[in-house]
Amino acid sequence: MKKPLVSPLDRNSTKQAREMADFYDETLGFTPNSLFTMMHRPRIAKAFLEMNQAVMENKGSITSSMKREIAYLSSMTTGCRYCEAHAIRAAERYGSLQERLENIWEYKSNAAFSESDRAMFDLAIAASQVPNGVSEEIKARAKKFFSDGEIVEILGVVALFGYLNRWNDSMGTELENPAVKSAEKILKERNIISEGTLYDISNVALLHHINQALRANKLFEKDRDY
């Protein structure tokens, strides 16, 4: 694995680093290396933690597991393997059914997903694209199923992970073993990857799978080459 652009600090380097580590040990079962990288500038790490807590707070029908599923789809759309693995790990810990995680790219047709799920995921994936892909039709379907506050929660997850996607892909953050195991379990069962290939950014087969899934859901207007 390539050396990250900036090496993460040790969890015991400061009192604040230890406190943040304790929080993530509870939510993920480990502390992400990305947090220890942010700790080179503690205000950034603190602001991120507060934003994370605010975004993941549930005030409506969007559950904790749904938010992690949104994060998974958003991160896979943008191509961030690190965040994708973390989202799968968190979705498992917050109660996402295995059936949903295994079939999430077929959410348009799979019986594990409701019409409101489909509207939610359409919005999340379209919002994750650059240029932005949120159409008037996608907006109308989202408004049909969700309140303004719930739409804010959905897009809050997309925006939060947009920051993380760019941070971790640019930093080359080293993926932690628990996250690797969670993600490989899901994608290996779908025969999308073989062991040890998931987080190789040059994995053309995986990127092709993403492209095909998005095209099948008619969320890309044109083919996208990888």
Which positions does each model-derived feature cover?
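Hydrophobic alpha-helical segments
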Residues: 1-226
